[in-house]
Amino acid sequence: MALSILPHLLVTSARKNNVKNEIVILTATSGDTGKAALAGFADVPGTKIIVFYPKSGVSPIQEKQMVTQKGDNTFVVGIHGNFDQAQTGVKKMFSDTELAKEMDAAGYQFSSANSINIGRLVPQIAYYVYAYAKLYADRKSVV
């Protein structure tokens, strides 16, 4: 659910804050997040998404789901390494100030679809509120 809402939250927030740059989502995945993020951002105006995954670290079905995702703004990169290496690479891109300057000059800026993005976490709060309310209504103890 959160990854279907995130693209629209980002685009709306960018518009309200007069952000003119196109948002480039960088995400590392070990499987399911990649497909969900690609599907959520597919053909969303003002965005591009690049998903990095370990070639030998996802199931064949997960890989096929990612590499066959439709969308003119979706890109998938299989790396030789594990998830931690993919995640480290993404973090390095985020912290590279020279790369950020080059991206800005070209009209782009980075963001993420991983859980470091508060826009991904906030919609998930609904799950916890619902579960609590249901337990309370059923008079079950909350752990």
Stretch-by-stretch model annotation:
Residues M1-V143:
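PLP-dependent amino-acid enzyme catalytic core
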